[in-house]
Amino acid sequence: MRSWVIPLLLAGVALAFDAADRRVPFSVLATGLLDEPAHLATAALGLLALACFIDAPRRFYVAGLIASVAIDLDHIPLYLGLLGNQDQRPVTHSLTTVLVIALAAAVSRRHRAVLAGCVAGLLIHFARDIAEGPPGVRMLWPIRDTAWTASYWWFLAMIITFTAVRLIFMTTGIPRRRARLFQPPVPVTSSETRSIPV
């Protein structure tokens, strides 16, 4: 498959499932079957764009994809009536969750790539949730309880930006070097070493 097909396919899936999700009346099953594929495709596209700039191990990207949909498991207590306000997304949909995982990544060298991937996946997930309009996302909880919302155009701009970045940078080969993250340094081969005159 040509390398430009995948970004375009992911963009199409994200836009199609998002459009259907906005039109279908809410129900746990129907909404989940439309909302989660849209989140997954959006995250995959965003991570492809990010991969133009960083060289990270596969587990970083796998963790990002999983986190981009797994965060919605926090809705289960809401649907079971175990949380008070059912008109709001759970407070785990906030930068507090991102900060906790980012701090864990900073102190855990062994799991740093996985945790950093989770951070990336969560940020992309929250960005799309914001673009779904009300009830929005309480990003600054517990400092502020105000929900952030944006229009569909925010989501469309995300998809266009991710797709354009991936296609343009992949085609031009720029940047020529990506930042190497969460991996041991590449050993210098003998051909790369410079002889020192005696």
Model-derived features: where do they sit?
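N-terminal membrane-targeting hydrophobic helices
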Residues: M1-V198
